[in-house]
Amino acid sequence: PTFHRSRSHDYVAKEVKAVRENLGASEVASFANHKFTGSGARAFLDRILAGHMPERGRVNLSPMLLESGKLNGDLTVACIDDETYYLFGSSVAQNMHLRWFEKHLEGVDDVIYKNMTDDFHGIAISGPNSRELLSRLTREDVSSDAFKFRDIRDTFIGGVPALCVRLSFTGELGYEIYVAPQYQLKLFEEIEEVGKDLDVKWFGGRALMSMRLEKSWGAWT
């Protein structure tokens, strides 16, 4: 079977086509979420991450390295305000990263760390019509100039408090929306209802991997 296309091939192709040409949605369940707060949060993250730190309301992609220079993590770092930062990374490497954070937090008294993986449940929307869908779910201006690529904001989407970032692993226009677990079903239902006439289609992990490969997006776990 490994030398032939799987039986899921045609279904995956339909999901990819929906995202590429119109609009798709997917649960974001494969990321670990970490929160750092405090007056020393920025300096701490600037020390353990190899990339540039983002400005307020922005996100950057940043590697995390071992002392030897080897890759220890590929993370998305978000700056909510001067003392609040989120890191999104691999759920597979979550415990390894937790140990790394704890090791470097020893003796640091101006940073508070919290694992937020169980507190954040996400849904991603992607495709040419994703901005139209988002505009129907929120009262805020989500035009390209007002909500730029790699912008992040606390807002209300579908009537529930949410953290929204303009970022997509599909390589298409897209957004990731994170809410507390008790609001995820509400968000799901709102996307289904509001996106009905847009013909929103749900897509899975195989479609996501196919699309990110076609756009040369790397993956590290």
Show the residue positions of the predicted features.
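Glycine/proline-enriched, intrinsically flexible loops and inter-domain linkers
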Residues: P1-T221
